[in-house]
Amino acid sequence: EPTSHLDLPNTIEIMQLLRELAQKTKKAILLSTHELELTLQVADKIWMMTSEKLKTGLPEDLILSGDLQKTFGTERFRFDETTGGFRMNYPANKEVSIQGDKGVSYYWTERALLRNGYKITENSPLWININGDGKWILHLNTHHQEFYTIENLLFTMSEWESKFLSE
């Protein structure tokens, strides 16, 4: 593992250098690593060893076939085929709906909500509108409030649940 004791920027640098070296010299470089998310971005071929067998293929083919999820997924986390990363499976005991822009703000809002025990549903009385310009609007019945950070949004959601939804 050539990068096992390096910080992230240096790990990325080494992986890029190894890829460039392999391309320039037309030689294969075989390495062992636990940096799976990074490997998916730089490897031309992956060899995955399980207790049953060896699976090989392009990173994209191993993802699309479901082999990465089967090999690395557990009850507590899963491999997300869309992002190429791992996602924690958080227990959800609250519901919220999200509407609006499906861009970067949506992704990070959803991630924060899941981490804080929310299940994203279609028709929750508690819902968030994301307008894409750094503003979130929280709605519950006749109540609504604007936010400019996810932290403040989450804080108010917790307050509203105690005040309005627990009645």
Model-based region annotation:
Residues T33-H34:
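H-loop/switch region of ABC-family ATPase nucleotide-binding domains
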Residues T74-E167:
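ABC ATPase nucleotide-binding domains
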Residues T11-K24:
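Helical segment within the ABC ATPase nucleotide-binding domain
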Residues E1-P2:
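Walker B catalytic motif
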Residues T39-Q41:
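A short, surface-exposed alpha-helical micro-motif characterized by mixed small hydrophobic
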Residues D7:
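ABC-family nucleotide-binding domains
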Residues A43-L58, G73-T74, F79:
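H-loop (His-switch) and adjacent beta-strand-loop-beta switch element
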